[in-house]
Amino acid sequence: MGFLKKLFGNIEKANKGEISTEEIVPPFTVDLVEEADDYWRQMEENLLINAVKAVGGPEAVERAFVLTNFKKNQETFELFYQMDGQLLSWREMDASVVDKISNQLLPQAAEVARAVNENYEEANVPVIQYAMLQFETATMAWFGRKHTTASPEAKLTFEELVSGWRAILEKEVPNRPLDSDRPFPYYEV
């Protein structure tokens, strides 16, 4: 992605006469950190899409919140949904949703963590321990924050992160318009 961005930027510069045509094609370099981040952004979006599909699609929920735990041998997801102005855990939903999340989404956690973090390992940067993702159906906006092994939040247990963020979400949900198009606060230490 970085290469194409540079290429198109250079084409614009050449069209304006700012650089010569010989300088249009940038040197091709592989930025492993950028590639890892790009892959993570794709995975964030896929996780949110699957979380929303699991409950019946965007018409079934107002917002979806996904927490990931990518710590070795602890990989899992925690999901919350805003429905009719109320924040619900996926465990509080009807049996078909609980079954779908338990049997289809949660078993993917270890593979998702491995796929994402092997890219960061290859780039020789801190790997993701936790992430907090949010999706707003009214605007189709999504947001995410990752916590790597270098983040102070990595020292938290997953339960501490889940309960801390849920407390923030429960406080924010009643006061946030459905089309706010901005992220809820994240839990931080």
Residue positions per predicted region:
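Low-complexity, charge- and small-residue-enriched intrinsically disordered regions
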Residues: G2-E23
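Acidic, proline/glycine-rich low-complexity IDRs
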Residues: G2-F3, T137-V189
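Surface-exposed polar/charged interaction patches
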Residues: N10, A14-G17, N46, N50, ...
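N-terminal "first-domain core" detector
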Residues: S20-Q86
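Negatively charged, low-complexity tracts enriched in Asp/Glu with abundant Ser/Thr
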Residues: L32-A36, S89-P107
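Extended intrinsically disordered, low-complexity coil regions enriched in Ser, Thr, Gly, Ala
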Residues: G57-E59, N69-V97, F143-S163
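Amphipathic protein-protein interaction modules
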Residues: N103-E153
